[in-house]
UniProtKB/Swiss-Prot annotation:
Coiled-coil regions listed in the entry: none
Cross-referenced Pfam families: Rpr2 (PF04032)
Disulfide bonds: none
GO cellular component, as recorded: cytosol; nucleolar ribonuclease P complex; nucleus; ribonuclease MRP complex
Protein's name according to its UniProt entry: Uncharacterized protein C16C4.19
Amino acid sequence: MDQERKLQFLLSIAAETYAISPSLSSHYLRRMFSLLEEWNLETDPKTLLHGCSKCGSLFIFGRNIKLRTISSERKARTDLKKGEVSRLGTNLEINCLVCSYVHEIPLGVPLRLHQSKQALRAKAIAESSSTKLESRKSAHNAKVKQRQRLRASGLNGILDRKKKKDEVAKSTSSLSLQDFMSPI
């Protein structure tokens, strides 16, 4: 077997045997991590989420692993401008609850959340007082329609609809007993 297939096999067999024998599963994971070191291969961050590289326990989220994201503090970085606060890198901290081993994986810099200044200016120009009034009117109309729907869906609305159906049925039926007896 080539190296990647062997590592993948060890990981899958560790996951399958955990329910039967956790110690055997731990042995397979420790063997996988020792082969990674022996072959001088880089450990994929996704691989570190499967099991602990120190004790070999298979991670079950909420039972024997604790994950959290850690971001750099603004106060610790004095060389940054105020606008670059959101560009600080974050790390994923993996804490094995079996052996208390902590491993950090860099997640990189998060994407910018704010819009560009040109887009903000264009948005401000597009919004004028007339559009605000129109939006208020449409919001008011939506509330009125919602109230009407709630009234119609209530008990009184159901009874009113049933009365209307009965009236329509009476007016359109030509074979009622009153209609038949009235000419006599």
